[in-house]
From Swiss-Prot:
The active site is at E52 (proton donor). Its cofactor is Zn(2+). Zn(2+) binds at H50, C75, C84. It comes from Buchnera aphidicola subsp. Schizaphis graminum (strain Sg). GO terms for molecular function: diaminohydroxyphosphoribosylaminopyrimidine deaminase activity; zinc ion binding. Binds 1 zinc ion. Residues 1-122 form the CMP/dCMP-type deaminase domain. GO terms for biological process: riboflavin biosynthetic process. Pfam families: dCMP_cyt_deam_1. Keywords: Hydrolase, Metal-binding, Riboflavin biosynthesis, Zinc. The lineage of its organism: Bacteria, Pseudomonadati, Pseudomonadota, Gammaproteobacteria, Enterobacterales. Belongs to the cytidine and deoxycytidylate deaminase family. Pathway: Cofactor biosynthesis; riboflavin biosynthesis; 5-amino-6-(D-ribitylamino)uracil from GTP: step 2/4. The keyword ATP-binding does not apply. This is Diaminohydroxyphosphoribosylamino-pyrimidine deaminase.
Amino acid sequence: MKDRFYMTRAIKLSKLGEFTTSPNPNVGCVIVQNKKIVGEGWHKKYGENHAEINALNMAGEKAKGSTAYITLEPCNHFGKTPPCCDAIIQSGIKNVIISSLDPNPKVSGKGVLYLRKKGISVKIGLMSKESQKYNKGFFKRMRTGLP
């Protein structure tokens, strides 16, 4: 029940980047420690920090041992920004709950595998339909190549 509460918050945060992140997706992240939100963020603008980094910056040391709720699978490749997976691992987060896998072939399951390989518990699919509706264009573009 609480998982849905935190993911709902992450989805609401993701909507804040609706007109500023293209061609990247809208992503929200909430970090929870002892049933309290200690960090939250969203991808604010293309080329700038992703949601996970903004949430980790807010959480600071409180991220250690926490759970992250993320609307889209974290990246584990270098693009305009460094991999979010590395930052998650370095922060000491123990659990990651992801709403949707990233359909981008550069990511698509690789972020999940990487986090699991590093000992982080990962769950996928919480409120996936709800989060994907705010990224319809991104999902369509990644799956079909069409705008």
